[in-house]
Every structure is written in structure tokens, then in C-alpha cells.
Amino acid sequence: MELSEYVQKGFQMLADPGSFDSNTFTLLLRAAFQSLLDAQADEAVLDHPDLKHIDPVVLKHRHAAAATYILEAGKQRADRSTLSTYLEDCKFDSERIELFWTEYQNNRNSLEILLGSIGRSLPHITDVSWRLEYQIKTNQLDKMYRPAYLVTLNVENTDSRSHPEISFSCNMEQLQDLVGKLKDASKSLERATQL
């Protein structure tokens, strides 16, 4: 499995019994599965009392690493030997490997359904709209307020024939960067089709 260095480091830290005891590891692993599989899950999955003693930044890093590995394992439909090999490479002991495998088996079907619902192709942008975001002035002189833009991309999902919208907010520089990248992508596609 090819994971980024950041994810690998976070995942290897989960193997350290000094950082995460067995109970904490199990709670974090269940929280990772819950945040992936439960649409209503939010940051409250990490609010368990036994996880309060861990620095929130460290906790979120390990949680993200575990969730990324779970998704990658599900995407590749990893079997027990594949999981064990990778976990051993990350210095997991046999107890943690068994805990991971048990949790993975319990959630495997739901994970495969989730991954299957995502689709196999990227959404196609069909339209874009933008507007200036409203700014409220305050009496704070130390902050400089710059215009922000609300951008809405209308997309078409060819797998599900749905037409969802993707909305985000950005500042002037980010908007210019987005427009530049879209122009570059358009030129690259034109060149590719002319070959």
C-alpha cells in the first residue's frame, strides 16, 4: 500500500504501546471506523473520556492516519495476510494486529458498500457561479478584511446520474489561482485531443 509519509508516520505512532495503550488504540480505531461509516458522525467521536489526555493535534493526526489506512485497505480489498504484513512493517505487535483485523472484519461489508457508492469516475463540472461574500465590519483595527467569494460548482456524476453542487469560500488570491489552474487544465486537454 502506498501511503504518504505523513500518514505512515501517524500510523506507526499507533503501534507504540507507550503512546497508545491497548484500550486507547481500540477506542481510536473504532472512532476511525465510525467517522468513515456513520454519516452523522462528527468530531464528537474523538470526545471519549479515555482520549482526553492525548494532545488534540496528535489525536487527530493518528485518527486521520488510521482512517486513511482503513480506506486504502478497503479499496484494495485487503485480506488478513496483506493487513498483517503491512501492520508488521509498521511495527504493530500481534495483539494490535488482531484488534485491527477484528474491527476491520466487523466493518468490512459496510466499508465496501461505502467505497462502491462513491463511484469510479470523477464528477464533471457543468457550470460555475460565484458571488461576493458579505463582510461585517467591526471596530477591530488590527484585522484587515479582504473580499471573500462564495463559489458554487455544478457537477454531474456520471456513475449515479446525480447533479450535486460543490460550494466553497475563497479569497481573491485563491480564486485567481483556481482560475489559472482551470485554464491550464483546459489547454492541456485541448493539446491532448489534438494529438
From Swiss-Prot:
Task: Name the InterPro entries on file.
Answer: COMM, COMMD3
Report domain COMM positions: 124-193
Keyword annotations for this protein? Cytoplasm, Ion transport, Nucleus, Sodium, Sodium transport, Transcription, Transcription regulation, Transport, Ubl conjugation pathway
- Give an example GO cellular component term for this record: cytoplasm
BP GO terms, sorted: sodium ion transport
Localization in the cell: Cytoplasm; Nucleus
Family that this chain belongs to: Belongs to the COMM domain-containing protein 3 family.
Q: What does this protein do?
A: Scaffold protein in the commander complex that is essential for endosomal recycling of transmembrane cargos; the commander complex is composed of the CCC subcomplex and the retriever subcomplex. May modulate activity of cullin-RING E3 ubiquitin ligase (CRL) complexes. May down-regulate activation of NF-kappa-B. Modulates Na(+) transport in epithelial cells by regulation of apical cell surface expression of amiloride-sensitive sodium channel (ENaC) subunits.
Spell out the subunit comment.
Component of the commander complex consisting of the CCC subcomplex and the retriever subcomplex. Component of the CCC (COMMD/CCDC22/CCDC93) subcomplex consisting of COMMD1, COMMD2, COMMD3, COMMD4, COMMD5, COMMD6, COMMD7, COMMD8, COMMD9, COMMD10, CCDC22 and CCDC93; within the complex forms a heterodimer with COMMD2. Interacts with NFKB1/p105. Interacts with CCDC22, CCDC93, SCNN1B, CUL3, CUL4A, CUL4B, CUL5.
Q: What is this protein called?
A: COMM domain-containing protein 3
The gene that this protein is the product of is COMMD3
